[in-house]
């Protein structure tokens, strides 16, 4: 459990016991609080739910795994589910940290099953230098910091993949089609993008719901900041979709190149088969089984057998080298 008490955007106390949270809010009527729970049990969340009036369906979503990113409205609070992500490389599976948040009037309660890097969130709140943003100091200020950290991680992951696309393109557009290892690399990138898209795609709508004209969830002074996060979420999704379209086009181009190579090989083999078929047909039709050196001799049989094996082996290695086998 991690706790913080904020007054006008500044920390007044932190890392105090959960039992002292309510007292701190009573002592400072204008303060808001952050409560962070790592891998809480159902009993832990039931206690928090009873203290802060959290809806049972929201508690159920917080305990479940792999919930889609969303923002749900309940009579006394909001429930938000988002994913902070990181991508070590374009071919590796993205690392996703699922974060659930209960947003009450004076307390932001975050729940996550993976330790992740919560320090990024606290650092984001602590380094805020904009006076208008910091002095607003409400729950919308804390939620803005959470959204900003999450969307920044998603945009950074999208940029990592986008920057690696040139090398993937160069590797896949070789003459004759990409080698199997490069093709598998392309499939790995597509899988990474698909997984990343599931985490990023709903974020623009999640942030936009906070800015609905019919709601008073965000202070007017904070609306430009939320719109900035919304814009970053849109750009992250556009980057992912652009990379996904690009890698799909590369895989399609590679498949077309392989088809062209196969057609060329088939044409050459058909041409050689036609050339060989003419003398074979004529000699077969006229029954021209002529004596050859060593005919009816033991050494002649050995010689012809060796010739067949050598010629067949040479043809096999030639075709193997050309990539036809």
Label the model's feature ranges.
Residues 1-219, 225-228, 232-242, 324-325:
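Peripheral, non-transmembrane regulatory/ligand-interaction domains of membrane transport proteins
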Residues 53, 231-325:
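Hydrophobic alpha-helical transmembrane segments and their immediately adjacent juxtamembrane loops
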């Amino acid at each position: 459990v991690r706790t913080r008490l904020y007054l006008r955007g500044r920390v007044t106390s932190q890392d105090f016991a959960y039992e002292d949270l309510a007292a701190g809010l009573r002592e400072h009527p204008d303060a808001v609080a952050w409560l962070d729970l790592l891998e809480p049990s159902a009993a832990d969340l039931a206690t928090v739910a009873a203290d802060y009036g959290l809806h049972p369906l929201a508690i159920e979503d917080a305990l479940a795994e792999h919930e889609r990113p969303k923002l749900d409205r309940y009579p006394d609070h909001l429930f938000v589910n988002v994913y902070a992500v990181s991508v070590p490389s374009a071919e590796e599976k993205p690392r996703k940290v699922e974060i659930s948040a209960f947003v009450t009037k004076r307390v932001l309660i975050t729940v996550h099953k993976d330790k992740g890097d919560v320090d990024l969130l606290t650092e984001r709140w602590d380094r805020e230098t904009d006076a208008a943003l910091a002095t607003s100091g409400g729950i919308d200020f804390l939620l803005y910091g959470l959204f900003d950290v999450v969307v920044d991680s998603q945009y950074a992951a999208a940029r990592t993949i986008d920057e690696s696309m040139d090398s993937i393109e160069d590797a896949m557009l070789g003459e004759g089609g990409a080698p199997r290892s490069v093709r598998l690399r392309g499939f790995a990138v597509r899988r990474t993008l698909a997984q990343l898209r599931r985490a990023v795609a709903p974020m623009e709508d999640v942030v936009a719901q906070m800015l609905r004209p019919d709601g008073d969830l965000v202070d007017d002074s904070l609306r430009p900041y939320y719109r900035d996060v919304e814009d970053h979420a849109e750009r992250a999704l556009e980057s992912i979709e652009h990379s996904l379209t690009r890698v799909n086009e590369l895989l399609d181009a590679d498949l077309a190149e392989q088809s062209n190579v196969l057609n060329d090989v088939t044409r050459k083999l058909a041409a050689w088969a036609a050339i060989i078929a003419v003398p074979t047909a004529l000699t077969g039709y006229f029954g021209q089984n002529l004596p050859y050196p060593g005919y009816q001799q033991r050494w002649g049989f050995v010689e012809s057998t060796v010739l067949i094996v050598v010629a067949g082996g040479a043809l096999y290695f030639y075709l193997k080298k050309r990539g036809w086998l």
